[in-house]
Amino acid sequence: MSGFYHKHFLKLLDFTPAELNSLLQLAAKLKADKKSGKEEARLTGKNIALIFEKDSTRTRCSFEVAAYDQGARVTYLGPSGSQIGHKESIKDTARVLGRMYDGIQYRGYGQEIVETLAEYAGVPVWNGLTNEFHPTQLLADLLTMQEHLPGKAFNEMTLVYAGDARNNMGNSMLEAAALTGLDLRLVAPQACWPEAALVAECSALAQKHGGKITLTEDIASGVKGADFIYTDVWVSMGEPKEKWAERIALLRDYQVNSKMMALTGNSQVKFLHCLPAFHDEQTTLGKKMAAEFGLYGGMEVTDEVFESPASIVFDQAENRMHTIKAVMVATLAK
């Protein structure tokens, strides 16, 4: 993986299809090695900074466990644990941390922040999530899809994303489709479509690789023949309450439920979600949604689908760690 050494991992379109495939192959090997007890530590002596301006469960745990497995040490800098952007500029933070650490992960707000870190740190910088892109999640998704459709190329798979596609997940899915040739369908209200410029760029690239990108409001035609149906949360605790009603009214028809799964016509269709999911009333927000909007038994996905054999969301969650490990090994190990 010498071609990746000291490279950044900021968004998928920074890579070629061959490079993306190499990362997925490395992730699969690292996963197999860990499960067989044959994993070789290739990051011994490395120090990694984890900057989290937004809290996280899966991303933090994935980076920490992956680093420990490979012999590296980590420092967690949480939302209140650093001066980045407050008392110290991003540029200066990058230059300080780059003198102390071998790699830096950033999870937070604007893409320009992680890009600035990468420009000035002098060490590999990895995007754990920004407002615009979530590339590590898509690596995990692609590995999970390969595992559940073995022997099929990506340009033989159909992935549907239902719900709000104007976010970092929608953007990174477009980039993934551009590189892999997936048949990607964003099934969403038009108000929730990604920016037209990114759609056009990714559509042109997808066609070159044997795939296509479709944006539609029509659920029946959009999900027909799908191999995978994917969704994400509609609201978050950080948003004002008045936004909740507006968002739910807009997206309610796009809930992933047994009817939508059946409309695919594929008895083997699988369900994907980047988590956390509001599929029941066992969370603070889930309880509020149920009480205020009558969303009992799930918001963006029903509990029935989430807990069904079609759901592979915990395979996805596990694969966050294996794919993140691949990114760190590829960029830090000689």
Curated annotation (Swiss-Prot):
SUPFAM superfamilies xrefs: Aspartate/ornithine carbamoyltransferase (SSF53671)
Biological-process GO terms, alphabetical: arginine biosynthetic process via ornithine; citrulline biosynthetic process; L-arginine biosynthetic process
Protein task: Reversibly catalyzes the transfer of the carbamoyl group from carbamoyl phosphate (CP) to the N(epsilon) atom of ornithine (ORN) to produce L-citrulline.
Entry EC no(s): 2.1.3.3
Family under the similarity heading: Belongs to the aspartate/ornithine carbamoyltransferase superfamily. OTCase family.
Catalytic activity: carbamoyl phosphate + L-ornithine = L-citrulline + phosphate + H(+)
GO molecular function, one term: amino acid binding
Binding site for carbamoyl phosphate: 56-59, 83, 107, 134-137, 274-275, 320
Keywords, sorted A to Z: Amino-acid biosynthesis, Arginine biosynthesis, Cytoplasm, Transferase
Pfam families: OTCace, OTCace_N
Main location class: cytoplasm
Subcellular location(s) of the protein: Cytoplasm
Gene that this polypeptide is encoded by: argI
Pathway(s) the chain acts in: Amino-acid biosynthesis; L-arginine biosynthesis; L-arginine from L-ornithine and carbamoyl phosphate: step 1/3
Binding site for L-ornithine: 168, 232, 236-237
GO cellular component: cytoplasm
Class in the EC hierarchy, top level: transferase
Entry protein name: Ornithine carbamoyltransferase
